[in-house]
A protein has these predicted regions:
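A cross-kingdom feature that marks ATP-driven nucleic-acid transaction machinery
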Residues: 1-98
């Protein structure tokens, strides 16, 4: 992701998130149009429990700006949870960020 930002001269800003209750998001990308919360999972499976930090950050952001909630994982299928979080295979996520 850092390489994409540099190579494509995107000008993205990076941070992370942790709430007082311990909910975390590994990477937050701020683009000109969007805020993208990314939780990175090493496994091949994801579950609704993996969405906790993204949902917490989404509640904080509210409707102030468009917020995409992504989990990037080593699985093969793109998934969408009922709470709006999307799970992306690594390669598909990198292509989508371009």
């Amino acid at each position: 992701v850092l390489y994409l930002n540099q190579a494509l001269r995107k000008g993205w800003r990076f941070s992370s998130y942790r709430s007082e209750s311990g909910a975390e998001v590994d990477l937050v990308i701020e683009t000109d149009r969007d805020l993208i919360g990314i939780e990175v999972k090493a496994g091949r499976n994801v579950s609704p429990a993996d969405t906790r930090g993204l949902v917490s950050l989404g509640e904080l952001v509210g409707r102030k700006r468009r917020f995409k909630k992504w989990i990037i994982y080593r699985g093969e299928w793109k998934q969408r949870f009922d709470n709006g979080v999307e799970a992306w295979p690594v390669i598909e996520a990198l292509k989508a960020l371009r």
